[in-house]
């Protein structure tokens, strides 16, 4: 399934609704006709849309307060749903975070039933030979000590069972100077098992390995490409 993130800081509500109409509208809509004129007769039927990305963190532009984002998320989400009522919207935020759960996620549950969670674990560099074993186990253990722990904390803070978790960014942290290893593959396999185990009890409805190309599953060189250990999982 495609999953598109809008930018409520740079784009207007109308522009975001127009993107929805371009993707999902038929010949009776203005932007659906534009898509058809460009050679794509059938709608893309993009169901999943995120109301921005990582709001609440210092590196993101826009209103990074829980109440401010909640207000903006409602105005944008409402406009997008007018263009395509069957969308499943996902709200953003620095989760787990009790304030954001109360002032943003719960306030948006009627239009955005999914809430985004991101987590990356630090990959050891395997610089010291005597530390290899400890570094290896520490990275694998992060599935439970970091990622599963975040899921449980977020589930508790969200409270409302109508709110579902979208674990839409997870990976071993990428560094161009560190080659992928079997460690990445075992972490990925362990993470997939954790997501399956927690899907029901913790309400995880969606998960996305990010980023797929050159930071995770697929490595692209100038003359060839191949699956990394993560990609082979």
Give, region by region, the residue ranges found by the protein language model.
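Aromatic-lined carbohydrate-binding surfaces of glycoside hydrolases
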Residues: 1, 5-23, 96
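A generic secondary-structure signal for well-formed alpha-helical elements
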Residues: 2, 19-30, 53, 76, ...
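Acidic, His- and aromatic-enriched active-site or binding-groove loops in soluble protein domains
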Residues: 22-43, 70-71, 113-122, 187-194, ...
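Active-site groove signature of glycoside hydrolases
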Residues: 29-65, 118-121, 161-172, 211
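Noncatalytic carbohydrate-binding groove/subsite architecture in carbohydrate-active enzymes
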Residues: 65-192
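Aromatic/acidic polysaccharide-binding cleft in carbohydrate-active enzymes
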Residues: 163-233
């Amino acid at each position: 399934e495609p999953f598109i993130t809008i930018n409520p800081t740079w784009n207007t509500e109308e522009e975001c609704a127009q993107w929805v109409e371009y993707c999902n509208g038929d010949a009776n809509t203005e932007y659906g006709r534009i898509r058809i004129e460009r050679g794509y007769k059938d709608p893309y039927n993009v169901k999943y849309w995120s109301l921005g990305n990582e709001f609440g963190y210092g590196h993101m532009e826009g209103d990074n307060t829980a109440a401010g984002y909640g207000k903006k998320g409602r105005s944008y989400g409402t406009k997008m749903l007018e263009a395509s009522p069957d969308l499943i919207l996902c709200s953003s935020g620095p989760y787990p975070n009790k304030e954001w759960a109360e002032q943003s996620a719960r306030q948006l549950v009627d239009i955005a039933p999914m809430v985004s969670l991101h987590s990356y674990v630090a990959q050891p560099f395997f610089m010291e030979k005597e530390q290899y074993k400890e570094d290896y186990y520490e990275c694998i253990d992060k599935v439970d000590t970091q990622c599963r722990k975040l899921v449980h904390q977020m589930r508790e803070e969200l409270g409302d069972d109508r709110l579902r978790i979208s674990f839409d960014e997870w990976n071993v942290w990428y560094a161009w100077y560190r080659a992928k290893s079997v460690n990445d593959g075992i972490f990925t396999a362990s993470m997939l098992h954790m997501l399956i185990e927690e899907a029901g009890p913790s309400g995880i409805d969606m998960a996305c390995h990010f980023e797929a190309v050159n930071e995770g599953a697929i490595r692209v060189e100038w003359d060839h490409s191949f699956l990394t250990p993560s990609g082979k999982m």
